[in-house]
Structure formats: C-alpha cells, structure tokens
A protein has these predicted regions:
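Short acidic (Asp/Glu) and glycine-rich catalytic loops that position anionic groups and cofactors
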Residues: 51-56, 209-215
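Long, highly charged amphipathic alpha-helices
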Residues: 76, 185-190, 228, 232-236
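Short beta-strand
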Residues: 92-95, 201-207, 248-252
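Signature for HUH/AEP ssDNA processing cores
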Residues: 131-206, 216-225
Length: 337
C-alpha cells in the first residue's frame, strides 16, 4: 500500500514482477515464424507458453491480412519495439473482430492471465487502484496482441514513478480542411521552435492522420510541469502562425483548415500509439519513425504499413534509438516556472 494517498499530482505505483520461476526474454535467438496450418497454437518461448487463438481470422479482409500476420509482424519488430515500451503501464485497445470492427478500451489486466505477465498497479486520486499490464518481453507482447490489440498505447512515465515522464511531445492533428502538406509544414515549424530552445526532436508518422514529435527529457519534472510547458509552446506557435496552427483544444472552437498542435496528450494518464504500432486503418499503416529530411521531402502516412516496415528497419535500424540514450536527454529545468 502507498505511504500516502494519491492526489491530483501524486500517484503511488507498484510493479508486480513475474514469478521468479520464469525467465524474462526479449527476442528469441532466431526469427520466430508462426505456422500457417494452425488456427490455435500453444507457443513456447524459453519456457513460457503463449496461447495464440483464431490465427486465421481476417483483421483486414480487403488486404487479406489475418491475426496471424499481425502477430508475426510484432514478433519481427519486437527487437526494436520492446526497448521503447518496457516498464510502462499499457492501456489495451482491443479489436476482437479486426480493424473495421468495434473496439473497447481495457486498463485492468484480464484474469486469468499467465503468471509471467507483470503489472503496474497505479493508485488514482479517486481511490481506485488499476493493475495495468506491462509488456516486458516477446511473450507478453504476443499475449497482448492476441487479445485483439492492434496498436500499443503505453504511458510516457515508467512505472517506478508514474508522475515523471521521459518525454515531452506534440501530436499534430489536421483539423477538417487542413491538408497533409499543412501537417508537414507545421512539423517543420515545431522542429525549428524546438531547435531554437536547444531541444532535440524526433518525428514519427502517427499511422493515422498526423505526426508525433517527441523530445526526450531528463527525468525529474512532473507530468503537470511538462504539460504546462508543452501548452505554452503550442500557444506561442499558434499565435505566430495563426493561418496554419491552432492550439485550441475544444473542437467546437477550433478554426477550420488549421493543424492542431495538441499539447494535451502530455496530461497525466494520457497515451499515444507507440512507435512501430500498426494502426486500425484501411491500409494497416504503421506509426513509423522518420527523419526530418523525409519530412522535408513530403513523406506520407501510407508510405509505411504492416507489409513493408520490417524491411525499412532492416535497412535503417531504429531511428528512435537515440531516445533510449540517457546522455541525449534534454534538461527542461531552465524552462520550468
């Protein structure tokens, strides 16, 4: 139990580790290939058994992409994906009938579940304690995807201190009437603003409609402090570029044809689709890290999808690997009020 109760700005958390009898693994020694002649499968990975079900179910009927294909994709990219999501609470967004079907959010890890699934128990100000699953390794990743999760939505703060995030970020979202070219232009405006502050910035496509821009930060500021700074930056950009950018959060008040620089996703408990997440879009697009040069050249959302991102990773590696380097994190302290 927490030493003191949760408040709006303080949320105790506890990690429930896996059974000591099970060994954590990241990726298998050789590429994991799921058989195509089985509908259900008990898959053993270094002593852990993952039950995979309904492998032949079409998740994208028009593309011929099955649940097996989705699981295979995540197995293939797990080596570069897992370092970005370990030790973080995961909000599950489940699509049991595929990308075009109904979905529902699920925060609490379902029971029964394998003994090797680790939990992040977070105390909320309401008094509730929510046991979120943590994806620590390949078996846990496949277990979550098998539940019908198409994309992954992890917290920005690690479970050992859920009030202090590792990132400041912006979600660039086109308001009706705005074009993709407007989104690209906005991304460059945000980049230049962050550059002027000395902040390193890393873009990725959302896989849906926009661009995410992340700044890796030295852990220390609270989520509220990070949100406040992101809000200030967004409003300054909107004031300087009124025909291009809006920072108005209320939908009814947003001017048409602008790009929302959404700072509000920095709020406590919010999530964005993770790096390398497949999105439930008609083309199975993937949220993919890109270079600023690619942004300048006009990269498009549909350039990256479930069937080609693996080859991109083989060629370029993980473009977001610098976000994992503690030495490359930016200290926000001088900008905090």
């Amino acid at each position: 139990m927490p030493v003191k109760p949760a408040t709006r700005d303080y949320h105790p958390a506890r990690i429930e580790r896996a059974s000591s009898k099970t060994k954590r693994t990241t990726t298998p020694a050789k590429r994991l290939v799921l058989p195509r002649n089985k509908t259900n499968l008990d898959l053993e990975i270094e002593g852990r058994v993952v039950k995979l079900t309904n492998l032949g179910k079409l998740f994208w009927p028009e593309l011929g992409i099955t649940k097996r294909d989705l699981l295979q994709y995540y197995a293939d990219v797990s080596e570069v994906l897992l370092p970005h999501i370990v030790d973080r609470a995961m909000v599950m967004k489940r699509y049991p009938n595929g990308a075009a079907g109904d979905f529902f959010f699920m925060k609490r890890a379902p029971s029964p579940r394998p003994s090797w699934i680790e939990l992040c128990s977070i105390w909320h100000g309401s008094g509730n304690v929510i046991d979120f699953p943590i994806i620590q390794d390949l078996p846990a990743l496949l277990w979550v995807i098998n539940l019908g999760c198409i994309d992954l939505n992890q917290w920005y703060a690690r479970c050992d201190d859920v009030d202090r995030p590792d990132y400041l970020h912006f979600d660039l979202d086109p308001v009706p009437g705005a074009t993709w070219e407007n989104v690209l232009q906005t991304a460059l405006v945000v980049r230049d603003a962050l550059d002027s502050l000395g902040m390193p910035s890393y873009p990725k496509t959302t896989g849906s409609k926009g661009i995410h821009i992340y700044v890796p930060i030295v852990r220390g500021p609270t989520q509220k402090q990070v949100w406040t700074l992101a809000k200030e930056i967004a409003h300054v950009l909107a004031s300087a570029n009124p025909e291009l950018i809006t920072a108005i959060y209320k939908v009814a008040k947003r001017p048409k044809g602008r790009v929302l620089v959404d700072y509000n996703q920095n709020a406590w408990g919010r999530t964005l689709a993770s790096i390398y997440s497949v999105r439930p879009t008609p083309k199975a697009c993937v949220s993919t890290p890109v270079t600023w040069k690619e942004i300048e050249k006009g990269v498009r959302i549909e350039d990256f999808h479930l069937r080609n991102v693996r080859k991109r990773i083989e060629k370029l590696g993980d473009l977001w690997k610098p976000l994992l380097d503690k030495k490359k994190r930016f200290d926000l302290t001088p900008y905090l009020k």
